[in-house]
Amino acid sequence: MLAIVPGALSQDDLARIYSEAQQAQAAGDLQTATNKYEAIVRLRPQMAEAYANLGNLYYQQGQADRAKAAYRKAIQIKPELGGPYFFLGVIAFGEHDYPAALRHLQRAQALQPPNVLIHSYLGYTHYARSAFREAAGELEKAAALDGTDIDVLYHLSKSYGHLARDSYAELQSQFSDSAYTILARAHLHESREDWKAASEQYRLALEKMPDNRRLREKLQWTQARAAGAPASNPGTNDELIDASLMYRDSSPSGPKLKEEMVRSQSKLRELLQGAKSDKSVYLIAETYQVLSFLTSLAVFETDPDSYRAHQLRAQLLEESKNDEGAIVEYRNVLKRKPDLQNIHFAIGSLYWKEQHFEEARPELEAELKINPNHPQALYELGDLSAFTGETQIAEKYFLEALKLEPGMVEAHFALEKIYTQNGRFEKSLEHLQKALHANASDPTAHYRLALVYRKLGRNQDADRELAIFSQKQAAPK
């Protein structure tokens, strides 16, 4: 076979091989394209773009390690190339290495003009780290560039939902006796159609805002519904009093939906920049809730039969305690996207909570085939194994869960129970101390420490832990 000498390769020869590689790639012949690019980088080892293209081919074929090596070589030669940083970020995201994903994606963002994919993956990465404010910011930018991407819209809706819950928690914590806190509770009960509880909260809110006409209308309406009357919601919606329930009876669609989303986003930015008060925190929470709802409507409007639309329906059914309906919808998700993470887990977890262990196990195991690094699935499989007396298997699952999530208190408690039953008290103490470190406010660890110390004959230590337990139990929540 005739060997090609690197120095003898003409520009025309190189162009020909490049053309052949591109033709093979366009035809879907990834192996031939890969072989061509491998030849090119051997002959021109300083050609950064060829390494980047080779990395793309490895990535398309699921060869992540080879792709990473090619991308790193590309940016070593030419640091201003943005593409390799993006794909390194995507690979790191898939490997759950979120710090590396952020680092690479932010570098790609700095090197390239606004790009929907970079904003999307930055949003997904922030979301995976529970940095929901940052996630929403990136996903808003992605949605502005492409308002039809259901994955972007789904994660944006969920980010807004998490931010709403965080803001409601802040409202309750800092302004527990405020009329706005009471009003937020009324909205929660009304959304669940718990008319008696809703009317009671509206009554309490009206005591603090006795001159508010709309609040009085809401009280009378919920009282009528609590009494069984088929009363329609009277009056005109008030943005302050109705807030997150503004669209309960009439949902916007088409251009009006986009207009309302933009208006709510603008309103939210103003609220976040203003001074903090009970009213502002209430409005922030309610506006996040509105945005979560509107963005979910955008998912349904974009593709009502998409896997994300069915996933949102499943989650709504789960929140309303309709587990059977939720499972049906989760299975509809799997019909459309069998490899979507967290769906088998959602089904298995619903079965697990109801102690339907035979149905739960195969779902949780299926989740681990898709995502072996799912700490909660590992924990629940450990719990199933412990329940059936398979303590060695349970121990293995719990330890694997803790490798991924060292602060999982439930797994530490589960291991303590196994070790205590087996007389391995030092291991019991180790995991109780770790549970205490993970959540110092929980008195349970102190009580269980006292029991283990008592078994070891360390009565003074046991008395101390019981005293701490009693003190924490008596502390105001």
PLM features: residue spans?
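Alpha-helical segment of the N-proximal tetratricopeptide repeat
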Residues: D13-L43, N56, Q60, H187-L188, ...
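Helix-start (N-cap) detector for alpha-helical repeat units in TPR-like alpha-solenoids
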Residues: L14, A48-E49, G82-G83, V116-L117, ...
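Structural signature of tandem alpha-helical TPR/SEL1-like repeats
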Residues: A26-N35, A39, Q60-K73, G94-R107, ...
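Structural marker of alpha-solenoid helical repeat scaffolds
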Residues: L43, I77, L111, L145, ...
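TPR/TPR-like (Sel1-like) alpha-helical repeat modules
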Residues: A142-D146, Y154-H162, S173-S176, Y202-R213, ...
